[in-house]
Design a protein with these regions (language model features):
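A glycine-rich, coil/turn loop motif that links secondary-structure elements
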Residues: 29-39, 54-58
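Metallocarboxypeptidase
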Residues: 279-425
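Extracellular-facing binding/remodeling surfaces
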Residues: 1-2, 18-31
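Active-site/substrate-binding loop(s) of hydrolase catalytic cores
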Residues: 172, 186-196, 200-340, 348
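Short beta-strand-to-loop junctions in surface cap/lid or active-site-entrance loops
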Residues: 164-172, 180
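Short glycine- and acidic-rich boundary segments immediately preceding or forming the N-terminal edge
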Residues: 3, 85, 96, 116-162
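Conserved hydrophobic/aromatic packing and binding residues within compact polymer-binding modules
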Residues: 42, 97
Length: 425
């Protein structure tokens, strides 16, 4: 994270404010604005940790606040410790401690042994904007609280941020869900991350998700999520991109398209390439359409790039998809409350029936993709190359970026889609 101080704004400030609140050091509700109340809360936290109370969030403060950023503490066992005393000290549940430490024998705790202790809040926040730093902390937190979750970086963005893939389950049916191909559609990232945490928690607790036992879902399916395809672009939109050459270059690109609001109208990666127009499925047609619309150079949106799969983020997802060979993909976008399920005249077996199911449980319409947007997308490429069901889900209504006030309705509409897609029913 960047150094944050009075006057700083953006997603990283909101993340810090969330962590201070979790650590019970007060401050305002997370609003992404580093004002006097936030400074006072940070100073109180710094004093409690023996740090210089300068009210500046730097590396030392970030390390001290890490348990509340990632959702767990690491405790070194001392003589006299028990699971009950640890649960009381950290306000943690015994079940959560046991889930995070599957090899643990609670009757033979050894001094010097290290345990992961989940803290009493969800790892995934749904009330603040997302950014790459929050994604990294959430990956860290979920993989430590639920060791069966596998995480890997499938590639790097233009600015070398990891593009994470998270996998859970051991079933024969492999499915792949992605989100935030487009920077100003970042609200789809917490959608996938909340689904993942909900599924993991339900599995550990023996509970259901959308009426299906989580244990059965993970027995029948292997779910892989790529929740943040465009980390650099999301950082730009949510105010987490540091000052420097990349931000200056993006501003110069945006200045060439004054009709597009900046940064809220930014969909592309940080180099001005639209990641969902990068796939070799009618790419030349997409190029002709978008060039005719004036997007013939790096732009905040709709520039197809110099050739297919030249943007590192799209290339990474395509290569990963080919290696995974999934039975189905969902690509999450905003907005329109609509499901796009076809590419040209391709209609993979079972795809219409699933689209009808998704529409029924979500209340979304299912439609053919409009011609001008119907080429070079990830879903298009998957259907063309794999002849299997692929869907673009356009969540919510309004102007991107959608406000977080829509998150709960988006969550309610998509819980069934995410579950039925895994099960294939």
């Amino acid at each position: 994270m960047q150094i944050l101080k009075t006057g700083s704004t953006g997603a990283e400030v909101a993340l810090m404010q969330t962590a201070l609140s979790r650590a019970q050091h007060g401050g305002p509700a997370p609003d992404g604005i580093f004002g006097g109340a936030t400074k006072s809360a940070l100073q109180a936290f710094q004093r409690s940790r023996g740090l210089t109370p300068d009210g500046i969030f730097g590396a030392e403060s970030e390390r001290a606040l890490a348990p509340w950023l990632r959702g767990y503490a690491v405790h070194t066992i001392r003589p006299g410790d028990s699971l009950f005393s640890l649960a009381e000290r950290y306000d943690a549940s015994l079940a959560a401690i046991e889930t995070a430490n599957p090899a643990l024998d609670p009757f033979t705790l050894r001094p010097g042994q290290k345990l992961v202790v989940p803290l009493p809040f969800s790892v995934v926040p749904t009330d603040i904007p997302w950014c790459s730093a929050l994604m990294d902390y959430a990956v860290d937190g979920l993989t430590h609280r639920y060791p069966q979750l596998r995480a890997e970086s499938i590639g790097r963005s233009v600015l070398s941020r990891p593009v994470w893939a998270l996998t859970v389950g051991d079933g024969l049916r492999r499915v792949l869900y992605s989100a935030a191909h487009h920077a100003n559609e970042w609200i789809t990232t917490p959608l996938l991350m909340k689904y993942l945490e909900t599924l993991l928690h339900a599995d550990a607790a023996g509970e259901t998700v959308f009426g299906y036992p989580a244990e059965d879902i993970l027995f029948r399916a292997t779910l892989t999520l790529v929740p943040l395809v465009d980390p650099d672009g999301v950082d730009l939109v949510t105010g987490a991109l540091p000052e420097g050459e990349a931000k200056e270059r993006a501003a110069a690109i945006a200045a060439d398209f004054p009709a597009i609001p900046y940064p809220d109208g930014w969909k592309a990666n940080i180099a001005g390439v639209d990641l969902n127009l990068q796939y070799p499925a009618g790419w030349d047609t997409a190029r002709a359409i978008k060039f005719a619309q004036g997007y013939d150079r790096p732009a905040p949106r709709d520039f197809v790039g110099d050739a297919p799969l030249t943007a590192p983020e799209s290339a990474a997802l395509a290569a990963f998809t080919e290696a995974l060979d999934p039975a189905l993909v969902l690509a999450y976008h905003t907005q329109g409350n609509v499901i796009y399920w076809k590419y040209l005249n391709f209609e993979p077996e079972g795809s219409r029936a699933l689209a009808e199911q998704f529409a029924a449980v979500s209340g979304y319409a299912y439609e053919d993709t409009p011609y001008a947007s119907g080429f070079a997308g990830y879903k298009d490429w998957f259907i063309q190359n794999f002849d299997r069901p692929g869907y673009t889900i356009e969540c919510g209504l309004g102007e991107n970026p959608l406000p977080l006030s829509q998150f709960e309705s988006i969550w309610s509409a998509n819980l069934g889609i995410l579950t039925l897609a895994a099960l294939g029913i």
